[in-house]
């Protein structure tokens, strides 16, 4: 990695719809306009269909979650306990942070992530 460029990591929990990840992708595109050559890695629970990502932006899909009618977060498609899914998602996020080494970590909407899944990463950073 060329450490002369800005590395930005973004997080969108995205348990319902695509609004959060779309907002982060808009911010990422604007960031590249203002700081050409930057690298932006977006971690999200949903993958927007047919998203044309410019050079410098990429997206990592986290295992999906959903918010049920009582406001509780649950695995969307995997038949595992939410604590196990939290561990999987948290581990992916932490691994990306340790290898990508972002200069900036932007979290959309839920400051410590769903179930607090960002706490290990925030502590590391």
Question: What does each model-identified segment do?
Answer:
Residues 48-50, 105-124:
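An aromatic- and histidine-rich active-site surface loop
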């Amino acid at each position: 990695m060329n450490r002369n460029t800005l590395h930005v990591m973004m997080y969108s929990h995205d348990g319902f719809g695509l609004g959060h990840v779309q907002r982060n992708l808009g911010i990422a595109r604007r960031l590249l306009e203002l700081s050409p050559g930057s690298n932006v890695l977006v971690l999200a629970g949903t993958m927007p269909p047919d998203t044309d990502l410019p050079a410098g932006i990429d997206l990592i899909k986290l295992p999906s979650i959903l918010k049920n009618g009582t406001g509780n977060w649950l695995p969307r498609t995997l038949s595992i306990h939410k604590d196990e899914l939290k561990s999987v998602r948290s581990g992916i996020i932490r691994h990306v942070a340790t290898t990508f080494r972002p200069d900036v970590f932007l979290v959309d909407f839920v400051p410590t992530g769903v179930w607090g899944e960002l706490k290990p990463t925030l502590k590391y950073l």
